[in-house]
Amino acid sequence: MRLSNIFADTSKARPFAAGTSIFEKGDKGEEMYVVKEGEVDIFINDFHLETVIPDGIFGELSLIDRETRIASAIARTDCTLQVVDKRRFLFLIQETPVFAIQVMKVMADRLRRVDLLIAKSDFGRTNRGPQN
């Protein structure tokens, strides 16, 4: 099932022009987003982590851990985003297993990507922990 099927209701869809900041690192995270149209770039500081394409999600981490945003999101192109607040997010996680699995998959993919980046960086080569 595609996320766009879960979010067929466009009442909470919001347009963003290319170059518009959707959220910034350090912001309080009270919503997550599903890309309906267009593309969104995710940055950690000045590092480009990924480009989220239609049917992709972002901003979910702050809904789970209640911490501030660790990344910034900027509209790469003109885009339309489905906004999901905390109440709706919790409902979907509980009532729609496909949605819950999709969120876990996105988080796992991002964790793997960051793990690979750390392993390839100087940090990954110089901080291996205690040596026997």
Regions found by a protein language model. Name each.
Residues 1-132:
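Cytosolic regulatory regions built on CNB/CRP/Popeye-like sensor folds
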